[in-house]
Amino acid sequence: MPFSFIHYIISFSKKDNFLKKDAFHAGMRRKRLLGAGAAACLIPALVLGGCGTGRAQGEDERFRQYTREVFCQEISSDLVSLHYTLKEPEKYGISGAPAVFGEFTVDSAQIKAACENMETALTAFSYDDLNIQNRITYDILEYYLEAAEESADYLLYDEPLGLVSGVQTQLPVILSEYQFYDRGDVEDYLKLMQSTPDYIDSLIQFERQKSEAGLFMADYAADTVIEQCSAFLEMGDGNYLYSTFSDRIAGLDELTEEEKSDYIEDNALMMEDCVYPAYQTLLAAVEELKATGQNEKGLCYLPEGKAYYEMVVRQSTGTEQTVRELEDLARRQIVEDLEAMESIVGITRGEAQETAASMGKSDAELILSELREGISAAFPEYPDTALEVKYVPEAMEEHLSPAFYMIPAIDNTQENVIYINQAQMGDDLTLFTTLAHEGFPGHLYQTVFYEGTDPDPVRNLFSFGGYVEGWATYAEMCSYYLTPLSKEQATLLQKNASIILALYALADMGIHYEGWSRMDAVAFFSNYGITDADTVERIYELIIGSPGNYLKYYIGYVQFLELKKEWVREEKEEFSQKKFHEAVLTVGPAPFDIVEEYMWEITADSGADE
């Protein structure tokens, strides 16, 4: 599949206030394997797959040698992937990478060939002789190769200019968070900025091919992309890529003041000569291609669109359940949540919302501190880490998410950043649960805990949105019970949030699989008391522009609930939330079938020899 920088995006709505809530993991890694850099996989696959290294090394050692080679080949294919994955690449024997963002490809034959080579390489290892951690990695590699082969038939169906997760909104964030550890990083960054026009040209060429195939985006989606590009350009000299560069370079003691001043001038030159012109070119291209799209409705109206959506659902949720089975799962969870709400007497949801709106919790740092302490009873310990809270620039508040977490390099998890969009926080409860989603026990906690288990680095190449976003949503739901609200108030509001999330997931499947029209969506939401036409219109268009986006965090969330129910049935009176959480977190991001298979033995075996 074509790729740019790597991200996870989710969208979330709070009852009457439609919000786009991203868990933007700007890790610039995961989901890289077998993308445009697929050729890089051929070398380790061919060399190590058939080489006679000998069983004397031990199967685990041979396998880890192989996965290390795959990891190093992949992350060194472009500078962004390398820098966002490793702070000290030299410790992995990597001297550098091309100063590019990546590229877009429609070469399905190349991807399939790389898959076949890696599948052949895997057969050279004795699965039964691998320890549990390596068996998990093997299973994930096998799963991912099958998924990549399947995706290769639908390359032009992908949309890199997504309304929530598009290149046009995320590239500036990637640049603004590019860390400067030394002078070389500054030089590399400037080269990267210089490469922006080539990267955007590659993107435009991809969009032209989509247009020729009748797969270009709907007109209203193109209008949104145009607005987002325009907003970035209109920032002019006030663009945060000027100020963030100055802030980062100020901390480099090895540079003289004169050198810092020169670099600041170089950055301004790159903005004027490369970045802004690239955005102007992109804006013009989208304006030109607008109206060439042939479908303004769900994916099922495209040729093979229904089959493509089924694939999207499998890969975004990490489940093998059919769309119809997931629809039933969502409806059953709605009934369960409604029954929990109906069992509460003496308080209304409206009263609970009024209390929650003024909890007196408005300081992000204090909330995060409280969350750290509050989760200690039910969640396992995690490595010490630092956290910086930053705020979305005012000029971009309309176009960026309420909050997002930046994934740190895997060898630098001590440094973490969460961005807050103050314009979209709404009330105290929104801020509290959002910080739980992004921080503790959500994305930040899950990332730091997992990296603390010393996993195989190759697993950082893969994206399992159902697990990652599902966990963060599960964490968000848990956080309602850590607020100052009474248990009854928390239950009402948490179950209500869960139901709303379910409705958006059902709408996603209804629009893209069942073929709902706009009026069908209006009728569906009106049945649940959501009658504001503008809100439903925005929901419909966002779902059109981001197929499967809601599913990865709602279905992922429900999958964690299902795993917990299974754990309770097995453990009975011995059930421990902390042990359950430790088990699923130690398995780490993976399809849910793999999580379920290994969660029972992983904690006991996590110290096995590698």
Residue ranges and their predicted role:
Residues M1-R29:
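N-terminal secretory signal peptides that target proteins for export/translocation
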Residues L19, F24-R29, L42, T53-A56, ...:
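Intrinsically disordered, low-complexity repeat and linker tracts
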Residues K31-I43:
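Sec-dependent N-terminal signal peptides
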Residues V47-G50:
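C-terminal motif of bacterial Sec signal peptides marking the signal peptidase cleavage site
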Residues G52-E610:
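N-terminal maturation segment of proteins
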